[in-house]
Swiss-Prot record:
May be a substrate-recognition component of a SCF-like ECS (Elongin-Cullin-SOCS-box protein) E3 ubiquitin-protein ligase complex which mediates the ubiquitination and subsequent proteasomal degradation of target proteins. One of its GO terms (biological process) is intracellular signal transduction. It comes from the Eukaryota. Pathway: Protein modification; protein ubiquitination. The lineage of its organism: Eukaryota, Metazoa, Chordata, Craniata, Vertebrata. Keywords: ANK repeat, Ubl conjugation pathway. The keyword Zinc does not apply. Gene3D superfamilies: Ankyrin repeat-containing domain (1.25.40.20). It comes from Macaca fascicularis (Crab-eating macaque). Residues 232-295 form the SOCS box domain. This is Ankyrin repeat and SOCS box protein 17. The SOCS box domain mediates the interaction with the Elongin BC complex, an adapter module in different E3 ubiquitin-protein ligase complexes. InterPro entries: Ankyrin_rpt-contain_sf (IPR036770), ASB17 (IPR039147), SOCS_box (IPR001496), SOCS_box-like_dom_sf (IPR036036). Transmembrane segments: none annotated. ANK repeats lie at residues 146-176.
Amino acid sequence: MSKSNKLCRKTSCPRSNIFCNLLDKIVKRPSLQFLGQWGYHCYEPRIYRSLAKILRYVDLDGFDALLTDYIAFVEKSRYRFEVSFNLDFTEICVNTILYWVFARKGNPDFVELLLKKTKDYVQDRSCNLALIWRTFTPVYCPSPLSGITPLFYVAQTRQSNIFKILLQYGILEREKNPINIVLTIVLYPSRVRVMVDRELADIHEDAKTCLVLCSRVLSVISVKEIKTQLSLGRRPIISNWFDYIPSTRYKDPCELLHLCRLTIRNQLLTNNMLPDGIFSLLIPARLQNYLNLEI
C-alpha cells in the first residue's frame, strides 16, 4: 500500500478547502515516500508557511472563509489519519491561526469573529473546534502543546480591548481558577507587545482596565492571594492595583445588582447564549449594556 493510501484515505473533500489542499500537498511530498519518515519536523514548516502566507494579509472576509474551511475540514472532510498525524496536523494549524490572531495581529474584530464562528463548540474543551481553549506559542515555535491559552496570553499582554471581548463571551466565567487570570494581570512582568495591526498602548492603563473588567465578571477576587505573592517578592505592574478592585469583591457584601448580573449571565452561559442572548432580553438598553460588561 502506498504511503499516501496508508496514511490518509480521502473519500470526499472539497477541492477548494484550504486545509484539504494543504494536506494533499504534504501527502504528495517526494521527501516523505515512506511512512517511517513522517515526523513533526517534516511537515510543520510547510503548514506554518502556507497558513502564514494567508493570515499575514487576510481581511475579515478572508479570515471568515479560512475558519469555515477549518470547521468543514474537521467535521466533514472524511479524511482518515493515523492518530498521531491527525493530532499533529490539527495542532499545527490551530497554533498557527491563534499565533497570528492574538500575537501578531491583535485585532479585536478578528478575535470576535473567531469566537462567533466557534462558539457552538466552546462547551467541549476537548473539541478541536473549540479554538479558544487550545494552546499556542506566542513566540512562534512548533510546540503548541506546551503553549498557553488565548485568555492567558491576553492577560499577560493586557490587551484590554480584546480581554473585554473574551469576557463578554463568558471565557473568564468558564475558567476553573479565574484568580490566576487576575494574578497574571497584576503580576506578570511587562514586556514589549509586537503587533502588526495594533498600535502600542500604555500597558499600565490597559492593566487597570483589565482589573475593572474582572470585577464586572467575578463575585470574589482574592486580594489575600495577591498580597501573598507580593510578600514573596513579586512586583505588581501597577503600584495602586488595590484601587481597581472594589471592596465588595473581597471584604464587603457583594452588591445585589452585581449578583443579579452574574445570575443572568450564568444562565445565558449555560445555554451558550453569551453575548447575543443579552440583546434578546426585553429590558432597557442600559441594563443590556450592564449585562454585557459595558458599565
